[in-house]
């Protein structure tokens, strides 16, 4: 295992996910810039490097820089995650993006690709040795091995790998976790499980029944976005959320955060991007 600096965040107690009867829609047009990273359709593999961190059968770190916390060890992530070097993490804008990775240069490598999600940052050390570096969970790293050879592959520590960007397919709808520090004048949300691009270029919010139109949220850190009331008055729920993916696709979850919302709870929408 290759050690590296880790981000330390407060790990919150897991709270229930609430399903709400909300509606939404997706618009498949490009808003602003188009992502320069291919989604893997019709493009070949690129060369990079891989290491692993955390326990041999673990999920890397539950204090990761994207903010997903203990969710990384649960479905749909299922510990198949990686901390991305700077070109992959992109100051948090790469959180939630999906990649296939395979290794062939070690006798323990199966040559079969595994799919991982970027959930953390690897900002220095070995993660700067290649243009793209994945510091994978022990589970994901071992999954590249031939049957029964996971420990042997992990003992190599550092691998040359091939990777490509692929669409995310989370098999559930987008969810929004309200940050524990939110209050009537400040709302911060963690965006999870966006299909397709996986990453987000922008997040907008609309207060109760269209009041004030769409307002741009600011990226707080990782996959968390925030809005402060600048009127001196409390923000007015229910809140609709509009997501713009890295390639410009727009998805709207109407009234997804209800009146009476509570900090620390997760609210699941009824919408997601096409995978």
Curated annotation (Swiss-Prot):
One Pfam family of this chain: DPBB_1
Record key words, sorted: Cell wall, Cell wall biogenesis/degradation, Disulfide bond, Glycoprotein, Membrane, Secreted, Signal
UniProt-annotated location(s): Secreted, Cell wall; Membrane
Disulfide bonds: 66-95, 98-168, 103-109
Protein name as annotated: Expansin-B5
Gene field: EXPB5
Cellular component terms (Gene Ontology): extracellular region; membrane
Family of the protein in this entry: Belongs to the expansin family. Expansin B subfamily.
GO BP, sorted A to Z: plant-type cell wall loosening; sexual reproduction
Record-linked PANTHER family: EXPANSIN-B3, EXPANSIN-B5
Listed InterPro entries: Expan_Lol_pI, Expansin/allergen_DPBB_dom, Expansin_CBD, Expansin_CBD_sf, LolPI, RlpA-like_DPBB, RlpA-like_sf
